[in-house]
Curated annotation (Swiss-Prot):
<comment type="function">
    <text>Catalyzes the last two steps in the biosynthesis of 5-methylaminomethyl-2-thiouridine (mnm(5)s(2)U) at the wobble position (U34) in tRNA. Catalyzes the FAD-dependent demodification of cmnm(5)s(2)U34 to nm(5)s(2)U34, followed by the transfer of a methyl group from S-adenosyl-L-methionine to nm(5)s(2)U34, to form mnm(5)s(2)U34.</text>
</comment>
<comment type="similarity">
    <text>In the C-terminal section; belongs to the DAO family.</text>
</comment>
<dbReference type="GO" id="GO:0032259">
    <property type="term" value="P:methylation"/>
</dbReference>
<keyword id="KW-0963">Cytoplasm</keyword>
<dbReference type="InterPro" id="IPR023032">
    <property type="entry name" value="tRNA_MAMT_biosynth_bifunc_MnmC"/>
</dbReference>
<dbReference type="GO" id="GO:0002098">
    <property type="term" value="P:tRNA wobble uridine modification"/>
</dbReference>
<dbReference type="Pfam" id="PF01266">
    <property type="entry name" value="DAO"/>
</dbReference>
<feature type="region of interest" description="FAD-dependent cmnm(5)s(2)U34 oxidoreductase">
    <location>
        <begin position="262"/>
        <end position="654"/>
    </location>
</feature>
<dbReference type="GO" id="GO:0016645">
    <property type="term" value="F:oxidoreductase activity, acting on the CH-NH group of donors"/>
</dbReference>
<dbReference type="Pfam" id="PF05430">
    <property type="entry name" value="Methyltransf_30"/>
</dbReference>
<feature type="region of interest" description="tRNA (mnm(5)s(2)U34)-methyltransferase">
    <location>
        <begin position="1"/>
        <end position="236"/>
    </location>
</feature>
<dbReference type="GO" id="GO:0004808">
    <property type="term" value="F:tRNA (5-methylaminomethyl-2-thiouridylate)(34)-methyltransferase activity"/>
</dbReference>
<protein>
    <recommendedName>
        <fullName>tRNA 5-methylaminomethyl-2-thiouridine biosynthesis bifunctional protein MnmC</fullName>
        <ecNumber>2.1.1.61</ecNumber>
        <ecNumber>1.5.-.-</ecNumber>
    </recommendedName>
</protein>
<dbReference type="InterPro" id="IPR006076">
    <property type="entry name" value="FAD-dep_OxRdtase"/>
</dbReference>
<keyword id="KW-0949">S-adenosyl-L-methionine</keyword>
<keyword id="KW-0274">FAD</keyword>
<dbReference type="InterPro" id="IPR017610">
    <property type="entry name" value="tRNA_S-uridine_synth_MnmC_C"/>
</dbReference>
Amino acid sequence: MPTLLQHAQIDWDDQGRPHSRHYDDVYFAVNEGIEETKHVFLGQTRLAERFAHLAPHACTVIGETGFGTGMNFFCAWQLFDQHAHSDARLHFVSVEKYPLDHADMARAVRLWPELAAYTEPLLEQYVAVHPGFQQFTFAGGRVTLTLLIGDVLEQLPQLDAQIDVWFLDGFAPAKNPDMWTPELFAQLARLSHPGTVLGTFTTTGWVRRSLVEAGFAMKKVPGIGKKWEVMSGAYVGPLPGPCAPWYARPAVTQGPREALVIGAGLAGSSSAASLARRGWQVTVLERHEAPAQEASGNPQGVLYLKLSAHGTALSQMILSGFGYTRRQLQRLQRGRDWDACGVLQLAFDSKEAERQGKLAAAFDPGLLHCLARAEAEAIAGVALPGGGLFYPEGGWVHPPALCQQQLQHPGIRVVTHQDVLELRKVDEHWQAWAGDQLLARAPVVVLAGAADVLRFEPCAQLPLKRIRGQITRLPATASSQALRTVVCAEGYVAPPREGEHTLGASFDFHSEDLAPTVAEHQGNLALLDEISVDLAQRLAVAELDPEQLQGRAAFRCTSPDYLPIVGPIADAQAFAEAYAVLGRDARQVPDVPCPWLGGLYVNSGHGSRGLITAPLSGELVAAWVCGEPLPLPRAVAQACHPNRFGLRRLIRGK
């Protein structure tokens, strides 16, 4: 996956229109742009009629090639507002190779003051837009935008979705020949179904013939303005072949839209919020007296991207998750609940410096860039042992605030002091039991209690492990207030929040005791010395009594491959029997449906990356539950799938 971001290179003509240097063409006609969009994309696909006939909670999925300035999205959203049921939903998926930066986007959308109700929410969330899948949520979850940042022929093959309406846009074939190819049309067909419709400006003969070959029935129709003719069509080809059954979509749960979420930390609150935004009534069962009492309860967590220069599944998820979390944080109070103060990772040895150099060469400077020591000290506000890698969009978060914000949806009910010990499936409903007491029941359950998901028999074989971590709370001093960014080496220290710095965090693979220890406080103070002797002196660490220090310990929960475990759960024994042939030939794809435990899902294993991966994993769970486009590339979603471990056991003969 390419990781370098190329923003659109734009010139502005004397009429205020953006002109693309890449394609030597304007994005839209200055006087007729909106009317052209309404005629070609909204009118020819009969979108108003489609929206008007949407049932409550039903979702229309629009796919687009070429997001550009977002005009088509804004017009579709406006039409949706005008015609759709208040409980219906719109999911808009668009590919863009050269996204506009924030300044250019803001300048472009000012040309349409009549669309301000739709352009302003995008501008508010238009942050951390990096290569890959980037998801946005608007109108309380009624509208979802998934931007695929990159080349259309690299991004669309990774999309797992079923598109209802195609806006085949992008610059004209003569200006953008690399996009208009049979490979593109094959992807449109793969993602379509009988009844999918398509609109496009182009009437080029070979484009029409290629679309027909791909399975679309196309026709020319009267155009608008200077465009005499345009094209519309419908998909009449065959359904695509099924994917491997162990990664196939479970049947969408029918009946009442009610769900249980077990656990009210980051994973649980994110799962609950994503379902509630889709019209589900969610009951969250939490064993403690309040949400965010375990690993999600630390005073400050670091929004830090530990990436690979090689585009691994984990790196792709981190890029997508980071953007999604940053957009969610815009709703919280900066300074109290979070701060985009940046994160500086020190190059503490030669190996780390080499790693940072490779990352800086692989990613956009707006995401990360190397700093020399003097530059790093100027940003951090304290003396440092060297330079490092700076993430300007990173920062710190108060995790309980994010959990509470997600749980405030009116469709969510949190019930505390509910320690679920057992699940039973009775009459298409899952029942949550504590001994002989029935706590709650619903057709859908999401297990989000970190390593505690192992207590439930369907998850017992998941290879989750707990790692104890302890943070230390240090009272801020007048001179320690100078720290202006999170600084990391082997540990991390954050700028003060409510008069305290958070310092951490230890890693203990053996202890099961959650009482903070003096030894680990001392270990954290040693980590602070490695980060900045100057800051340690400003905090008067030498005068602190480790036995009097405050802190907290919790368990991180992680998987062997460091990816979270997110998705539907299958019956482990039936799974092993159904696909036993893989033990003899891993290339086999048996034509046997996966034995799903209908309505049961998991969201766990986020390790120390929960702030980045858990919120987007809530969206991933909701997409599995509701049959919506996945918010991650298909291969990344599969890399997070619970079935990956059962497959590995079969293939390795264990």
